């Protein structure tokens, strides 16, 4: 009974890593720096309401930021987002 639970936990963890790890790698430069423009939108942990902008891979899009946490793909204006993330 204990072995079956352990194997299920290992399988679940393996699947979770297979899904999460490629997304993290795709946001990383060859020198190890993270390209914030490739990170997904993240509204953070709080329940406040701030309209912010994130780069979705093509353009800058509005989203609601909760005020705490999240990631660095978050800009106060569309102009700031485009300046940082849009490719010329």
Swiss-Prot record:
The record marks 47-48 as: Reactive bond for chymotrypsin. One of its GO terms (cellular component) is extracellular space. Residues 28-33 form a propeptide. One of its GO terms (biological process) is envenomation resulting in negative regulation of voltage-gated potassium channel activity in another organism. Expressed by the venom gland. Residues 1-27 form the signal peptide. Belongs to the venom Kunitz-type family. 03 (sub-Kunitz) subfamily. This is Kunitz-type U15-theraphotoxin-Hhn1a. The lineage of its organism: Eukaryota, Metazoa, Ecdysozoa, Arthropoda, Chelicerata.
């Amino acid at each position: 009974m204990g072995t079956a639970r352990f194997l299920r936990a290992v399988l679940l963890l393996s699947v979770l890593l297979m899904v999460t790890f490629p997304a993290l790698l795709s946001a990383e430069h060859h020198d190890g720096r993270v390209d914030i423009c490739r990170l997904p939108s993240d509204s953070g942990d709080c329940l406040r309401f701030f309209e912010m902008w994130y780069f979705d891979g093509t353009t800058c899009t509005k989203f609601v930021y909760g005020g705490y946490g999240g990631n660095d793909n978050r800009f106060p204006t569309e102009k700031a987002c485009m300046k940082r993330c849009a490719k010329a």
